[in-house]
Curated annotation (Swiss-Prot):
Xref: SUPFAM superfamilies: FYVE/PHD zinc finger
Taxonomic lineage: Eukaryota, Metazoa, Chordata, Craniata, Vertebrata
Annotated segments matching region Negative regulation of PKA-binding: 232-248
Protein's recorded name: Rab effector MyRIP
Keywords: Actin-binding, Cytoplasm, Cytoplasmic vesicle, Metal-binding, Phosphoprotein, Repeat, Zinc, Zinc-finger
Length: 859
């Protein structure tokens, strides 16, 4: 361990074999860490329980700290643990002979954890040897690779072998850092904290939603959060972790921008370019996974494969003739390349991201846990340019945190940058490096339905798209911004579902950023103006012609505005003047057709104020149901009638002018446009007389319109009243018929039950030897009638039994029908008067149905 390790003489196959061994070592350590994580969690829970119980002095003295059982004399005595100094019972501790002390079960598990994790070994060895194990092997392999590339002598000036590398550097490069990951600001701890914070946030959202018990939307939101709690927690935790990592990267890139780039020799860059072009991007061989950083285990591999990094604009190629290299499929903080295929990206990386690796471009300053002791190691650190993945995590306080800046980072605004006709200076500077990697979601279709998703809903893909543009966030902060656009962007970013895609989609088209809002405002104003205009004729008195024109205009504009609004929700960018003209023509055609059908029933005359009130009622009722244009036109027959009346007025006026002109002389002059013949009359006619005739015609037309409206109103009222009366009569009559039928059926069944009872008695007497004959004389008439009918039935049945042959079938049917009718009429008469029958019908029906059922069973 203390000897100098020289791996410069190994071949490629031997180096690959050594790397496989190192990778197996890392895999075994990862499995061991997973196995011990459950034990660590159990010990943490026990420690938190003890911290709470230890505050009660009476409990500590009289009860066991582990099982909480009370101490008793000679049965369950208390013993003090040698490690935690708590009083425990006999069943919760064991005696250590070599220590001559009692140790509780929890302290024994803690000792076992320390022994299995080899923490005691590294605590003793790290004071003697600064670098050992797998870290030492990788260090030497990296040095060998740097020597082969020829860059190490240029960096160090040939002083690489002058110092002993075994006594240099810091303890951060040793294997103990792997086992100390869970104690410091590691990615695993950060992910655990992010998961806990996300879970608390989801719980708080659920509790807030459940607080509104009277709101159905809140209850639905709470149920959705409960059903998708795990998915939302994972997405939110991933977003928090990416935000922390992005913040560190932005800080390092800002410092890289201020510092000069590290020069690379031409020979090294040429060699790497040749190797990069010869290696295929997807051609990972078996040892390709060996160069995966151990810190990458904190996040799933799917996210790592789906988040390609965006290169910083300051990284320019050293040689313009080189082919552009394929970017690594993993982020720079958790991806490493192979030694034989150097893509000028991080080559080697320790489990916590602290030890040296190969990286091109201007290196960010390294953040090691200890300061190196010599210039050799400093040169290696500068060349490696590896920043810790969890350095300075959680250092920001709540007051210093800028939420607008965080939202600007989370929102991928860089999608709109390539569409900007005037690029920023930073974009012009990076234009010669090749196109910047764009997000896959930038090619989405601008469908408005995609912007109105549920809740739905933020997905894991949105949080991953946020990570794609993390390295361009500091460029957008430096670039000048438009205050209005920035305000609109911030409003778009403040989404309830934490979905930054909305803002990017709304501002994706920079050529027409304000057309949609202006169009929407214009249509909204027009719609409100039409609604206000439709209410003014009822408040302000005016002439009949003005009222008709206003109502006609407002009703048509109201229909058009509602149609525009309904179509605008479907496709706001496809509304043109041509479609509006077509829709308006179709409305007028439908209005003409409806008016011809509905104005044919006009016979009476009614006043104009009643017509206006009816128009307002119909227009208000039609606004509530805007399912289709035809249904609105059917309900707004008053507006349609107004359109028809105005058309008829024009026709009558034109016909009158033609008749007047024909009476004075033949109309031989050519037709001229309406605007020219306006105000012109034929020769030889009196203008005053024509005005009087036209005025009288207009008055007659309006009076006829009032008559039509009055008749329509009366017809509608009569139809409603008739419908109500008809429906009410049908229901009551049907109920009476049902009651009568049920009563009759119950009475028939009751009579049949009595008959069957009598028959059973007669049969019993006959079996006993008695000869029963029907009685002829009765004392009372009422009993005589009833018994005569009953005895008639019994007599007929007894006679049928005594006859040698059954009677004819037709006679049997006739006899049974006649007797049934008589029994029914008799029982119906005995129910009482007609006034009491309706009151007792329901109760009697229910009571009589039960014996009917019993009689059916007896048959």
């Amino acid at each position: 361990m203390g000897r100098k390790l020289d791996l410069s003489g190994l071949t490629d196959d031997e180096t690959e074999h050594v790397l496989q061994v190192v990778q197996r070592d890392f895999n075994l350590r990862k499995k061991e860490e997973e196995r011990l994580s459950e034990l660590k969690q159990k010990l943490d829970e026990e420690g938190s329980k003890c911290s709470i119980l230890s505050k009660h002095q009476q409990f500590v003295e009289h009860c066991c700290m582990r099982c909480c059982s009370p101490f008793t004399f000679l049965v369950n005595t208390k013993r003090q643990c040698g490690d935690c100094k708590f009083n425990v019972c006999k069943s919760c501790c064991s005696y250590q002979k070599h220590e001559k002390a009692w140790v509780c079960c929890v302290c024994q598990q803690a000792r076992l954890l320390r022994a299995q994790s080899l923490e005691w070994f590294y605590n003793n060895v790290k004071s003697r040897f600064k670098r050992f194990g797998s870290a030492k092997v990788l260090k030497n392999l990296y040095r060998k690779h740097r020597l082969e590339s020829g860059a190490c002598f240029d960096i160090l000036g040939g002083s690489l072998f002058e110092s002993n590398l075994e006594n240099e550097g810091s303890i951060s490069g040793s294997d103990s850092t792997f086992y100390r990951q869970s104690e410091g600001h590691s990615v695993m701890d950060t992910l655990a904290v992010a998961l806990r914070v996300a879970e608390e946030a989801i719980e708080e959202a659920i509790s807030k939603a459940e607080a509104y018990g009277d709101s159905l939307d809140k209850q639905n939101e709470a149920s959705y959060l409960r059903d998708h709690k795990e998915e939302l927690t994972e997405e939110l935790a991933t977003t928090i972790l990416q935000k922390i990592i992005r913040k560190q990267k932005s800080k390092s890139e800002q410092q890289v921008e201020e510092e000069p780039g590290w020069p690379h020799p031409q020979s090294c860059s040429t060699k790497v370019a040749d190797e990069g072009t010869s290696a295929s991007p997807g051609g990972y061989r078996a040892p390709a996974a060996l160069w995966r950083s151990q810190s990458a285990f904190s996040i799933t591999g799917e996210e790592a494969l789906k988040t390609p990094p965006v290169e910083a604009p300051s990284r320019q190629p050293r040689d313009q003739g080189q082919h552009p290299r394929a970017e690594s499929a993993l982020p720079s903080w958790k991806s490493v390349d192979r030694l034989d295929e150097t893509n000028l990206a991080p080559v080697l990386q320790s489990p916590d991201g602290n030890w040296v690796a190969l990286k091109d471009g201007a290196p960010p300053p390294t953040r090691l846990l200890a300061k190196p002791k010599s210039g050799t190691f400093q040169a290696l650190e500068v060349a490696s340019s590896v920043a810790s993945a969890y350095d300075e995590m959680g250092s920001d306080s709540e007051e210093d945190f800028d939420w607008s800046e965080a939202l600007s980072k989370l929102c991928p605004r860089s999608r709109a940058l390539p569409r900007n006709p005037q690029p920023q200076p930073t974009q012009a500077q990076s234009s010669d490096q090749g196109p910047i990697a764009a997000s896959p979601s930038s090619a989405l279709s601008p469908n408005p339905e995609a912007m109105c998703s549920d809740s739905e809903t933020s997905s894991a893909g949105s949080s991953r798209e946020v990570g794609h543009q993390a390295r361009l966030s500091w460029l957008q902060r430096k670039a000048p911004r438009n205050p209005a656009a920035e305000k609109m962007r911030l409003h778009g970013e403040l989404d309830v579902n934490f979905n930054p895609q909305l803002a990017s989609r709304e501002t994706s088209d920079s050529s027409e950023p304000e057309e949609a809002p202006h169009t929407t405002d214009r249509r909204a104003r027009r719609w409100r103006r039409a609604r206000l205009g439709s209410e003014e004729p009822s408040k302000e008195p005016s002439s009949p012609s003005a009222q008709l024109r206003d109502l006609d205009t407002h009703q048509v504009s109201d229909d058009l505005s509602e149609t525009d609004i309904s179509n605008e929700a479907r496709d706001p960018q496809t509304l043109t003047d041509t479609t509006e003209e077509k829709r308006r023509n179709r409305l007028y055609e439908l209005a003409m057709k409806m008016s011809e059908k509905e104005t044919s029933s006009g016979e009476d005359q009614e006043s104009e104020p009643k017509t206006e009130s009816e128009n307002q009622k119909e227009s208000l009722s039609s606004e509530d149901n805007s399912q289709s244009v035809q249904e609105e036109l059917k309900k707004k027959f008053s507006a349609v009638s107004l359109c028809n009346i105005s058309t008829e007025v024009l026709k009558v006026i034109n016909a009158t002018e033609e008749l007047i002109a024909g009476s004075t002389g033949p109309w031989e002059s050519p037709q001229v446009p309406p605007d020219r013949q306006k105000g012109m009359f034929p020769r030889g006619t009196d203008q005053v007389r024509l005005d009087e005739q036209l005025t009288s015609l207009e008055e007659n037309v309006y009076l006829a319109a009032g008559t039509v409206y009055g008749l329509e109103t009366q017809l509608t009222e009569l139809e409603d009243a008739a419908r109500c009366i008809h429906s009410g009569t049908d229901e009551t009559h049907l109920a009476d018929l049902e009651d009568q039928v049920a009563t009759a059926a119950a009475q028939v069944h009751h009579a049949e039950l009595q008959i069957s009872d009598i028959e059973s008695r007669i049969s019993a007497l006959t079996i006993a030897g008695l000869n029963i004959a029907p009685c002829v004389r009765f004392t009372r008439r009422r009993d005589q009638k009833q018994r005569t009918q009953v005895q008639t039935i019994d007599t007929s049945r007894q006679q049928r039994r005594k006859l040698p042959a059954p009677p004819v079938k037709a006679e049997k049917i006739e006899t049974s029908s006649v007797t049934t009718i008589k029994t029914f009429n008799h029982n119906f008469i005995l129910q009482g008067s007609s006034t009491n029958r309706t009151k007792e019908r329901k109760g009697t029906t229910k009571d009589l149905m039960e014996p009917a059922l019993e009689s059916a069973v007896m048959y």
